[in-house]
A protein has these predicted regions:
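Tandem amphipathic alpha-helical repeat scaffolds
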Residues: 38, 44, 183, 261, ...
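Conserved Walker-type P-loop NTP-binding/catalytic site
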Residues: 2, 80-148, 199-202, 206, ...
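Alpha-solenoid helical repeat architecture
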Residues: 33-34, 77, 337, 377-383, ...
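Extended alpha-helical scaffolding segments used for macromolecular assembly and cargo binding
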Residues: 36, 50-54, 250, 302, ...
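Internal alpha-solenoid helical repeat scaffolds
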Residues: 59, 235, 270, 382, ...
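Helix-turn-helix DNA-binding segment
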Residues: 916, 923-980, 984-987, 991-1001
Length: 1001
C-alpha cells in the first residue's frame, strides 16, 4: 500500500454527496470495473481537499494510491503529473518492481533508467511504449491490490498527459483501477486544450463528472469554525467572511487567517497574498481588457454593459473585443441580457482595490454622470448605486439626494433595513448640503422619523429609540424649529413612536419613560381639530399604561383613543386602541370578549392596510387562542400573520418576530412537528443580530425535543447575543438544561437551569411565571440524583437533594402565585408544569405517586401532545413501581406511539429504557428485520436516507434515480411501515437498527 498524499486534518463539511460518489467509484474499482472521475470546480473551492480525503480512505481500504500534480509549465515537461506520482510511489517494493520491468517509464524516475528520453516522446513508437508501459503498470499493480491514480490540476497538463488520460480512460476495462483527474473550471476558456478532452471523456460510460459547487453558507461557516478552533470567531466577522468568500473555502481561509492575525484594516480590504493571486489572472490580459475590468469593478456587483462601455472610454470594436477576452477567460460572466458580473466577488474587490486614488474617483464621477440621467434612474436600486458613486466621487449634494430617493425605493420594496441605512446616510449628510429640505422634499424631523421607523421594522429597536430621543430633543431647541419643530403633528408622531418603541424594549425604566413621553405627547397636541396623529398618541398612551399595569387608566384612555380615532376617520388607529382593550379583557379573564375585540382589530387593521397594527393584532389574537387551548385556531392566525410579515419584509420587526415564534409554538404544542420543524428550519442558525438570535433560540424547542444535532451549532451562534437580550438567554438556557437532562448530565442541567431562573428574575417584573419551567427541569434532575443516592444507600445525599428539590418547588409555586396578577395568565401549559413540580417533588422524596402524575396529565389536557407523552412516560414508570403493570403498559404504549409520531428521539430512548427495566410494553428489540421485512432492498436504501434527513431530491441524487421515483419509493415505504410521516418512518428505521444515526429533521 502506498500513501502519497498527506491526509488532511478534520472532518469534511458540505461535500457528503460528492464524497459519496467518489467512494462509490472506489467500490466499483475494487469489484473489478475500471472507472474514472473528472472533478471540476473553481480554484480554491475544495477539489484538492476532497481528493485528499478520497485518497486517505482509499489507502485505508488497501488501495495502492498514486498521486501527482501538474504544474503551470505548459508542454515543456511532458508527463509531469505521472512522473510526480511514480516518484512518490517508487518507495513501495511492489511499485518499484513493476517499474523495473518497464524501461519506458524509467526516465520518469529521479535516477533515470533505460528507454526513450523525455524529449523523444514525439515519436509514435516512444509514445506507444510510454502509454503501454503505464497501462501495464496499472494492470500489474491492480492484480495485487486495487489502484487509485490521481492526476491533479489537469488544466495545466501538457499535451502528452492529456492524451494519456484519454488513452487510459478508453483502454482500462476490467482492471481494478480508479482514475481521478481534477481541473479548474474558471481556467477552462473556450480555446483551452483540455476543453475537447473533457467533452470526449464525459461521453464515455466509465467516466463520471463531479462538479464542486461553492459551499453553502452553513457548511462554509462550520468549516471556518473548525479551522479557527480553539479560537472563537465573532458572529458578525464570520458572517462577513462567509458572505465575501461566496462558498470558496480557500478564499474564506485566507480572509479568516488575516482577520485572526489582525492583518485586515477593515472588511473591505483583502490579504496581500490573496489580492496578488487574484490579480495575477487580470495582469495576463490586454490593456483594453484590464480597463474594462476596472470600469466593471467600479460599476458595482452587477455591471451594466452600456455603463461599462461608456466608463471604459474604449471604442465599440475595441470594447467588444476586450469584453470577449474577459468572458473567455472567465473573469466576467454575462448576467441577464444587458450586463456582467465578476466570476467571484473577491476578484472585483481586488481589481477595485488596485485602482489609483485619482483613477477611482474619476471612474465613480463618470458613473455618477451616466446614472444621473432620469431614464437610467427608473430601475429599482439605481438610486442606491448613484448614492454610492456620488459619495465615492465626493459629490455630497448628489449623494444626499440619491440617498433619500434610495430610501424611498427600499421602503416600497419592503426592505426596511436598507431603507434605514439610506435614510441614515442622508441624515449624516444633511448639514453638508446647501438646501437640504428643498433637495429632500421633507423636513429633517420627518427624515429622522422615517429612519427610526425603518430601523425598528428591521428589528433594531434600540437604535430607533436612540434616533427618536435625539430627534425629540432637537425639535425642542430653537434650531429644531427649522427642522420641523413647528409642525405639531410631526412632534406628536415622534413622541408617540418613541413611547411605542420604548415599551418594546421590555425594561422597567424604558416603560416608565414610555409613560412619561406618551403623557407629554398627548398633553402637547391640541385635541381640536381631530387628527389621526393625536388619536394615535392617545392609543399609545393607553398601551403604555397597560404596560405599567395601570389597567383602569389604560381602559379609560383606550376608549378615549377609540373615540378620537372615529372622530378623525382613522380606522387603523381604532384598531390600535381595540388591541389594547382586547389585551386588557384577556388579562382580566374575559377571554371571549378579548377574542372578539382582537378579531375586530385585526380585521380593521388589515382592511386599512396598516401592517404594524395588523401584526400586533394577529400576535395577541393568536396568543389569546393559544392560552385557552385553541391551538389550531391560534396556529391559523399566527400562520397568516407570519406570511404577511415575511411577504412585506417585516419578519424581524416588532410583532413580525413574535408572530413567527407563536406560529412555531402552536404547531410544537399541538404535535404537528413536521410543520414545526419546517418553521424552525427557517429560523437562521448563523445569526448576526439579536432578532435572529431570538428566533434561533425558539428553534431549540424542537431541536432539543428531537435530539437534533443542530442544538450545539445553534448554541455557538446565539451565545454572543445573550448579553444583548436577556430573554433570549433565558429561553436558550432553559432548553439547554432540558437537553442536558435528556443526556443524563444532571450537573449541566442544574447549571443551565440556575442561569435561566436568574435571568427570569432579572426581567422587568421580577418573580414571574417564567421561572416555573426551568425550576421543574432542575427539580427533575434533583429527583434523578435523589433516586440514585437512595439506590446506593447514600441517605445524606438523598436528603440534600430532597431539600434542594423543595427549594425549586417553592420557586415554581411563587411563579404560579405571581401569575395571579392581571398581567399574567397561567394557561393549561403553565398549570401542567406546576403540577409536574409537585409530581417531581414526590419522586425526589422517594414516593413516585401515580396520582400526582395523573394530575399533571389532566392539567395539560389532550391539546399538548408532547407534554402529554412526556407525562405518560413518568406515569407509566410510577404505575410500574406500584405494581399496576397493565395500566403502566397502556400509558407506555400511548407515549411510545406519540414519540414515534413526533420523532421525539430522546423521549423514545427513555421509554425504551423503561421498557427494558420494567418489562412493560411490547419489547422494542424486534427480531432482525421483522418490521422491515416487507421492504425491498432499494426501499431499505431509501429508508436509510430518509432517516438521515435527506429530501426526495437529495435521495434521487445519491441513488441516481429521478426525484419522482424517489417520491414513489417514499410513499410505498410509509404505507408498508404504517407510518404517518417521514419523521415516524425515520424513527422506525432508527429503532430497528437500519440507521445508526437518528435523523436531524
Amino acid at each position: 500500500m502506498v500513501m502519497v498524499m498527506r491526509a488532511p486534518a478534520g472532518r469534511m463539511v458540505g461535500r457528503d454527496e460528492e464524497l459519496g460518489r467518489l467512494l462509490t467509484l472506489l467500490d466499483d474499482a475494487g469489484s473489478g470495473r475500471a472507472v474514472a472521475a473528472l472533478v471540476s470546480g473553481d480554484a480554491g473551492v475544495g477539489k484538492s481537499r476532497l481528493v485528499s480525503e478520497v485518497t486517505r480512505l482509499a489507502d485505508g481500504r488497501g488501495f495502492t494510491v498514486l498521486s501527482g500534480q501538474c504544474a503551470e509549465l505548459g508542454d515543456s515537461v511532458p508527463y509531469l503529473p505521472l512522473a510526480d506520482a511514480l516518484r512518490g510511489a517508487a518507495q513501495s517494493t511492489g511499485v518499484r518492481d513493476a517499474l523495473s520491468s518497464r524501461p519506458a517509464l524509467g526516465r520518469l524516475l529521479p535516477e533515470g533508467g533505460e528507454g526513450p528520453t523525455i524529449d523523444s516522446d514525439r515519436s509514435g513508437l516512444a509514445r506507444q511504449q510510454m502509454f503501454g508501459g503505464v497501462l501495464g503498470l496499472l494492470a500489474e499493480l491492480a492484480a495485487a491490490a486495487p489502484v487509485l491514480l490521481v492526476l491533479e490540476d489537469l488544466h495545466w497538463a501538457d499535451g502528452s498527459t492529456r492524451d494519456l488520460v484519454t488513452f487510459l480512460s478508453r483502454m482500462l476495462h476490467r482492471e481494478r483501477v480508479a482514475l481521478i483527474g481534477t481541473y479548474r473550471t474558471d481556467d477552462l476558456h473556450r480555446r483551452h486544450p483540455l476543453r475537447p478532452v473533457v467533452a470526449e471523456l464525459q461521453r464515455l460510460p466509465s467516466v463520471i463528472s463531479v462538479d464542486l459547487a461553492p459551499l453553502d453558507p452553513s457548511a462554509l461557516a462550520e468549516h471556518l469554525m473548525a479551522v479557527a478552533a480553539p479560537a472563537r470567531i465573532d458572529a458578525a466577522e464570520l458572517n462577513d467572511i462567509v458572505t465575501r468568500a461566496e462558498g470558496n473555502a480557500y478564499y474564506a481561509e485566507e480572509l479568516l487567517a488575516a482577520s485572526l492575525s489582525g492583518d485586515l484594516a477593515d472588511h473591505s480590504t483583502l490579504p496581500a497574498g490573496l489580492a496578488a493571486l487574484l490579480l495575477s489572472r487580470v495582469e495576463q490580459l490586454s490593456d483594453a481588457t484590464q480597463q474594462v475590468l476596472r470600469a466593471a469593478a467600479v460599476a458595482g456587483s452587477r455591471a451594466d454593459d452600456e455603463l461599462v462601455r461608456s466608463a471604459s472610454g474604449l471604442q465599440a470594436a475595441e470594447y467588444e473585443g476586450a469584453v470577449r477576452e474577459a468572458v473567455t477567460h472567465q473573469l466576467l460572466v454575462p448576467y441577464g441580457t444587458e450586463g456582467y458580473v465578476f466570476r467571484h466577488a473577491l476578484l472585483r474587490e481586488a481589481v477595485y482595490a488596485d485602482l489609483l486614488p485619482g483613477e477611482r474617483t474619476r471612474l465613480h464621477a463618470t458613473m455618477c454622470s451616466l446614472l444621473s440621467d432620469e431614464q437610467r434612474l427608473t430601475p429599482p436600486g439605481t438610486a442606491a448605486e448613484l448614492a454610492q458613486h456620488c459619495l465615492a466621487s465626493h459629490d455630497i449634494p448628489g449623494a444626499f439626494a440619491a440617498s433619500v430617493r434610495a430610501g424611498r425605493e427600499a421602503e416600497q420594496l419592503g426592505a426596511p433595513a436598507e431603507a434605514h441605512r439610506h435614510y441614515d446616510q442622508a441624515l449624516a449628510l444633511w448639514e453638508r448640503v446647501a438646501e437640504p429640505e428643498q433637495t429632500a422634499g421633507l423636513a429633517r424631523g420627518k427624515l429622522g422619523l422615517l429612519s427610526a421607523a425603518n430601523s425598528a421594522d428591521s428589528g433594531d429597536i434600540e437604535h430607533a429609540v436612540h434616533l427618536l430621543r435625539r430627534l425629540r430633543h432637537l425639535l425642542t431647541t430653537p434650531a429644531g424649529q427649522a427642522a420641523g419643530g413647528k409642525d405639531v403633528n410631526l412632534v406628536s408622531r415622534i413622541g408617540e413612536r418613541l413611547a411605542f418603541y420604548l415599551m418594546l424594549m421590555d425594561d422597567n425604566k424604558a416603560i416608565a419613560e414610555a409613560v412619561e413621553v406618551a403623557q407629554a405627547t398627548v398633553g402637547a397636541a391640541p385635541a381640536e381639530p381631530a387628527t389621526w396623529q393625536h388619536a394615535r398618541a392617545i392609543a399609545t398612551y393607553a398601551y403604555a399604561l397597560l404596560a405599567e399595569d395601570s389597567y383602569a387608566a389604560a381602559r379609560e384612555w383606550a376608549e378615549r383613543g377609540l373615540a378620537a380615532a372615529r372622530a378623525a376617520g382613522a380606522p387603523w388607529v381604532q384598531a390600535d386602541a381595540l388591541v389594547t382593550m382586547g389585551i386588557l379583557s384577556n388579562r382580566e379573564g374575559r377571554n371571549d370578549e378579548a377574542i372578539e375585540l382582537l378579531t375586530a382589530a385585526h380585521t380593521q387593521a388589515r382592511e386599512a392596510k396598516v401592517l404594524g397594527v395588523e401584526l400586533r393584532a394577529a400576535y395577541h389574537l393568536a396568543r389569546a387562542h393559544l392560552e385557552r387551548g385553541d391551538l389550531s385556531i391560534g396556529a391559523s392566525v399566527a400562520h397568516e400573520g407570519t406570511k404577511r410579515a415575511n411577504q412585506t419584509g417585516l419578519g424581524l420587526a416588532p410583532y413580525g418576530l413574535d408572530v413567527q415564534h407563536l406560529h412555531f409554538q402552536c404547531h410544537f404544542a399541538d404535535g404537528k412537528w413536521d410543520h414545526a420543524q419546517e418553521i424552525a428550519d427557517g429560523f437562521p442558525i448563523r445569526v448576526t443580530s439579536a432578532p435572529e438570535a431570538y428566533l434561533s433560540s425558539m428553534a431549540l424547542f424542537i431541536d432539543v425535543a428531537r435530539g437534533n444535532p443542530a442544538v450545539a451549532e445553534r448554541r455557538a451562534w446565539i451565545e454572543p447575543f445573550w448579553s444583548v437580550r436577556g430573554f433570549d438567554g433565558f429561553i436558550a438556557r432553559g432548553l439547554l438544561a432540558e437537553d442536558a437532562l435528556w443526556r443524563g448530565d444532571t450537573d449541566e442541567t442544574l447549571a443551565e437551569a440556575a442561569i435561566a431562573i436568574d435571568l427570569a428574575y432579572e426581567a422587568p417584573w421580577g418573580h414571574n411565571p417564567s421561572t416555573i419551567r426551568p425550576a421543574v427541569v432542575a427539580l427533575s434532575a434533583r429527583a434523578d440524583r435523589a433516586a440514585q443516592a437512595r439506590a446506593t444507600g447514600d441517605d445524606d445525599t438523598a436528603s440534600a437533594e430532597l431539600a434542594a428539590a423543595g427549594e425549586l418547588r417553592q420557586i415554581a409555586r411563587e411563579g404560579a402565585a405571581f401569575a395571579k396578577r392581571p398581567k399574567f395568565i397561567l394557561g393549561p401549559e403553565g398549570h401542567g408544569w406546576l403540577a409536574r413540580a409537585e409530581a417531581e417533588y414526590c419522586r425526589a422524596s422517594g414516593v413516585n405517586d401515580p396520582q400526582a402524575w395523573q394530575a399533571v396529565l389532566d392539567a395539560f389536557g389532550p391539546a399538548y401532545i408532547y407534554e402529554t407523552a412526556r407525562t405518560q412516560w413518568r406515569l407509566a414508570e410510577a404505575l410500574a413501581e406500584a405494581g399496576r403493570r397493565d395500566e403502566a403498559a397502556e400509558q407506555w404504549r400511548q407515549a411510545a406511539h406519540t414519540a414515534d409520531k413526533l420523532g421525539a428521539r430522546p423521549l423514545r430512548r427513555a421509554l425504551d429504557d423503561l421498557a427494558r427495566r420494567a418489562r412493560i410494553g411490547a419489547a422494542q428489540e424486534h427480531g432482525d428485520g421483522e418490521v422491515l421485512a416487507a421492504l425491498t432492498s432499494r426501499e431499505r436504501e431509501v429508508l436509510r436516507l430518509i432517516a438521515a434527513g435527506r429530501s426526495n431530491r437529495e435521495i434521487a441524487s445519491v441513488l441516481f434515480i429521478a426525484p419522482k421515483t424517489a417520491s414513489v419509493h417514499v410513499s410505498n415505504i410509509l404505507g408498508k411501515l404504517g407510518a404517518a410521516s417521514r419523521t415516524e418512518a425515520a424513527a422506525i428505521a432508527y429503532r430497528e437498527g437500519l440507521s445508526s444515526q437518528p435523523s436531524a429533521r
